[in-house]
Amino acid sequence: MGAVAINRKRSDESFNFINQQSTNPLRNSPYFQASKKRRFSFAMSEDSGKPASSNPTISRISRYPDAKAPLRREIHAPSRGILRYGKAKSNDYCEKDANFFVRKYDDAKRSALEALRFVNKGKDFVDLGDEVEKEEVVSDDSSVQAIEVIDCDDDEEKKNLQPSFSSGVTDVKKGENFRVEDTSMMLDSLSLDRDVDNDASSLEAYRKLMQSAEKRNSKLEALGFEIVLNEKKLSLLRQSRPKTVEKRVEVPREPFIPLTEDEEAEVYRAFSGRNRRKVLATHENSNIDITGEVLQCLTPSAWLNDEVINVYLELLKERETREPKKYLKCHYFNTFFYKKLVSDSGYNFKAVRRWTTQRKLGYALIDCDMIFVPIHRGVHWTLAVINNRESKLLYLDSLNGVDPMILNALAKYMGDEANEKSGKKIDANSWDMEFVEDLPQQKNGYDCGMFMLKYIDFFSRGLGLCFSQEHMPYFRLRTAKEILRLRAD
């Protein structure tokens, strides 16, 4: 219910409160909080001294006081004091915002006026429209002296401009047409605080650049002379050196003698399925029978087996015996030697001590130039070589693998073998151990056994390993032919 006086009439304070609300200039502010309105009844506030009107609504509205226009004053934003150490911080956010927009306005106006220096009257024109009407520029010559701008706040500002570098503006008045002479000059003139003396294109700066370049020219000439002199000295040194003639590697003919038609026909008949159970060759010294099924390992894409490898190594030893001057003195261990020497229980010299007796071989191992040891590693064949002539231990893998344990075991074996058979002490552990890298390598997964046999064949001839993967099909046919005839060529 509204507040009512004792005599059932409204007090004058209620009307004063309404009048204050309508005239409060901060009413439209977002931070303004209006107090709660007083509620009262118009029916109880009628004056008894005045006659009642026929239209009660009009009579009630006429009793309200006329709204008074608020005083024209600058609008201030609300401020909030930030208490710090008991003191309120001065609020200058409104002032900063006002200064920010003023600066933006001044910068835009200055840029626009600077661009007008390069505007002339002409046939080709750009209509500036209503924006030109707000400016009044008076100029009697090619330079702009002053500009008077009237803004919405009734403030007048006068800006002095620098004289232009060309007759860009002759007479600019309200409503006239303009033509832009050079847009590049207009863009360059947007910087009002340029210093012409510091411009790199000025004559003084150009002279300084020329002087510094002349100083460098003398140094560059001296360096150029030294370069030419050193090039001549280098050419004289190259001419004085003896020319090195590259030695042409001669590929021997014997390891690559092609098979005749009869020899190829003989090999293909042995590979036929009719001879799988037939014994095609028997090596008496090693007591190994070569059947058609065993010989099938020399067909393309097949893995070599122990019988073929061991028979071929026996044939290489017999070839050396026939022509000892043509081939190196070598010993060829079979594929079971290393498995006996190094088993699952470890190194065991006693397991192979009887393999190399003087009575069985007719010579001592320390008298051989090379000793070949085939190594079978489950699904891959590799080769270890004991080179007595050069006191080296070599390991050859067609897949470029390494295994130091194999060479260490063979070094220990050579020491035990020399002490057991000859009574000599040999420290093979001090020999060079080399894992040969520059050697022919296989390009598939089934020619490792063939590569191993050819390593042995070429080393026993005293030749380098001058073959490749392309020769493997030929070597398979040739090895089959030599096994069938029990003679290695």
Curated annotation (Swiss-Prot):
Membrane-crossing segments per the record: none
Topological relation to the membrane, as annotated: Peripheral membrane protein
Domains as described in the record: The N-terminal regulatory domain is required for peptidase activity in vitro.
Catalytic residues, chain numbering: H380, D397, C448
GO BP annotation list: positive regulation of flower development; protein desumoylation; proteolysis; regulation of flower development
Enzyme Commission numbers on file: 3.4.22.68
Function per UniProt: Protease that catalyzes two essential functions in the SUMO pathway: processing of full-length SUMOs to their mature forms and deconjugation of SUMO from targeted proteins. Cleaves precursors of SUM1 and SUM2, but not of SUM3 or SUM5. Able to release SUM1 and SUM2 from conjugates, but unable to cleave SUM3. Acts predominantly as an isopeptidase, cleaving SUMO-conjugated proteins better than SUMO peptides. Plays an important role in the control of flowering time.
SUPFAM superfamilies: Cysteine proteinases
One Pfam family this sequence matches: Peptidase_C48
Protein name: Ubiquitin-like-specific protease ESD4
Top-level taxon: Eukaryota
Activity regulation behaviour: Inhibited by thiol reagent and N-ethylmaleimide, but not by ubiquitin aldehyde, pepstatin A or benzamidine HCl.
Compartments where found: Nucleus membrane
Outcome of gene disruption: Early flowering under both long and short days and pleiotropic alterations in shoot development.
Cited InterPro entries: Papain-like_cys_pep_sf, Peptidase_C48_C
Coiled coil (residue ranges): 200-223
Enzyme class name: hydrolase
Regions of compositional bias (Polar residues) in chain numbering: 51-60
Assembly behavior: Interacts with NUA (via N-terminus). Interacts with KIN10.
PANTHER family, per database record: SENTRIN/SUMO-SPECIFIC PROTEASE, UBIQUITIN-LIKE-SPECIFIC PROTEASE ESD4-RELATED
Tissues in which the UniProt entry reports expression: Expressed in seedlings, leaves, shoots, flowers and roots.
Keywords from the named record: Coiled coil, Hydrolase, Membrane, Nucleus, Protease, Thiol protease, Ubl conjugation pathway
Keyword Zinc-finger: no
Gene induction: No circadian regulation.
UniProt GO molecular function: kinase binding; SUMO-specific endopeptidase activity
